[in-house]
């Protein structure tokens, strides 16, 4: 395991930021049902921001074509809540520059991405997210490896019913 980052601390910071932003979004859109929440990153997992989707947003302007495409979702809260995450990821980068990693994917990328996924999973298990809220962690310009991580995350984070809806959507629009 890498000595560059405390993955438990990262997961905790992500959980706190997600819980705060999701709660704020629920308050802001209290007359509307939140249907999706996603964490977006890059292939080096050096950035992290969130997006969300509501029933009203989905039905306005016929956004059904992007229902399961978080990079197209139009809602978010202030990313200031992710400042601690950004600081930790930036510190990782400084240390990372000083070392060469033979197993970069296994030591850096995968566990960082996994910390993001586990944060959402724990919040789902704690009841922060209702069962009908689609959750995802994804790269905004993904390599094949990141697509595999996203797919595994979707399976871990969502019910069979949501995955079936996602697969139907993907067959139609993906």
Can you say where each PLM-predicted feature lies in the sequence?
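Glycine-rich, aromatic-bearing surface loops/beta-hairpins
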Residues: 125-174
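Well-ordered, non-membrane alpha-helical segments in soluble/globular domains
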Residues: 10-21, 106-119
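Polybasic, proline/glycine-rich intrinsically disordered low-complexity segments
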Residues: 58-113
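Short N-terminal edge-element motif at the start of the domain
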Residues: 1-34
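N-terminal interaction modules that seed assembly of large macromolecular complexes
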Residues: 25-65
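Polar/charged alpha-helical tracts
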Residues: 8, 12, 90, 99, ...
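Surface-exposed acidic, glycine-flexible loop patches that form ligand/cofactor-binding
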Residues: 26-30, 124-129
